[in-house]
Swiss-Prot record:
Annotated membrane topology: Single-pass membrane protein
Chief location: plastid
Gene assigned in the entry: psaI
Name of the protein in its database record: Photosystem I reaction center subunit VIII
Key words of the record: Chloroplast, Membrane, Photosynthesis, Photosystem I, Plastid, Thylakoid, Transmembrane, Transmembrane helix
Function of the protein: May help in the organization of the PsaL subunit.
Organism, as annotated: Cucumis sativus
Record InterPro entries: PSI_PsaI, PSI_PsaI_sf
């Protein structure tokens, strides 16, 4: 049962850091490819 309680404490910062990083990287690549700015 200890793994069930420790999983959220690992996934919350992981999702909070990795998801915005992937979103910003994909947005940056999208802008670089299309040369909007």
């Amino acid at each position: 049962m200890t793994t069930l309680t420790t999983l959220p404490s690992i996934f919350v910062p992981l999702v909070g850091l990795v998801f915005p990083a992937i979103a910003m990287a994909s947005l940056f690549l999208h802008v670089q490819k299309n040369k909007i700015f």
